[in-house]
Amino acid sequence: MKKVRLKELESRLQQVDGFEKPKLLLEQYPTRPHIAACMLYTIHNTYDDIENKVVADLGCGCGVLSIGTAMLGAGLCVGFDIDEDALEIFNRNAEEFELTNIDMVQCDVCLLSNRMSKSFDTVIMNPPFGTKNNKGTDMAFLKTALEMARTAVYSLHKSSTREHVQKKAAEWKIKIDIIAELRYDLPASYKFHKKKSVDIEVDLIRFSF
């Protein structure tokens, strides 16, 4: 198995460029390097669901999770996002790191599932939390991810929605494991944010069949 230290992975992910002008409507918050590194390190070392696997990253934004996945030896990682500007930055990032096991597709993630059913070993994502104007987006992303994955889906969800997520998983007859509880340091990206940054508690959840 490809050996990468957590600190080393985090410091490499710190070099990934983020959103230049985040779009509120798309709930664009960057996945911080610390969170991305913890998430990918756990998936790689505990479950071996990255190396030589075909991985999808839904709502990939500027590509921090995809790039980390490619660094950890994925056979191929494909990032999906609706936002052309974010994918342009993603493309620059991939070129900067000279990664060849990575690709990106511009599309509406919620319309993907029929075309991509069971096409990926693993799906990873930090979906929109479904607050503000996008209620239920997190669950729509999750439903799509579960249709695309053959083995497992790894996703970040606000800890405050844990019961709701567990209920949905039971309804869909999906196995659910909360594999880490993390503090998501949300930077003040938008004008209406009063504080410099806010800590949100999030669960890293593994969904499997």
UniProtKB/Swiss-Prot annotation:
Its EC number is 2.1.1.-. CDD domains: AdoMet_MTases. rRNA N6-adenosine-methyltransferase activity is inhibited by zinc. It catalyses: adenosine(1832) in 18S rRNA + S-adenosyl-L-methionine = N(6)-methyladenosine(1832) in 18S rRNA + S-adenosyl-L-homocysteine + H(+). GO terms for cellular component: cell projection; cytosol; fibrillar center; nucleolus; nucleus; postsynapse; presynapse. InterPro entries: DNA_methylase_N6_adenine_CS, rRNA_MeTrfase/Polyamine_Synth, SAM-dependent_MTases_sf, Small_mtfrase_dom. Changing G61D: Found in patients with intellectual disability and microcephaly; uncertain significance; impaired interaction with TRMT112. Gene3D superfamilies: Vaccinia Virus protein VP39. It comes from the Eukaryota. It is found in: Nucleus; Presynapse; Postsynapse. S-adenosyl-L-methionine binds at Q28, T31, G59, C62, V64, D81, D108, V109. One of its GO terms (biological process) is positive regulation of translation. Expressed from very early development (8 post-conceptual weeks) and expression persists through adulthood in multiple substructures of the brain, including the cerebellar cortex, hippocampus, and striatum. One of its GO terms (molecular function) is rRNA (adenine-N6-)-methyltransferase activity. Keywords: Cell projection, Intellectual disability, Methyltransferase, Nucleus, S-adenosyl-L-methionine, Synapse, Transferase. It is linked to Intellectual developmental disorder, autosomal recessive 72: A form of intellectual disability, a disorder characterized by significantly below average general intellectual functioning associated with impairments in adaptive behavior and manifested during the developmental period. MRT72 patients manifest moderate to severe intellectual disability, microcephaly, and dysmorphic facial features. Belongs to the methyltransferase superfamily. PrmA family. Catalytic subunit of a heterodimer with TRMT112, which specifically methylates the 6th position of adenine in position 1832 of 18S rRNA. N6-methylation of adenine(1832) in 18S rRNA resides in the decoding center of 18S rRNA and is required for translation and embryonic stem cells (ESCs) pluripotency and differentiation. Heterodimer; heterodimerizes with TRMT112. This is rRNA N(6)-adenosine-methyltransferase METTL5. The lineage of its organism: Eukaryota, Metazoa, Chordata, Craniata, Vertebrata. The gene is METTL5.
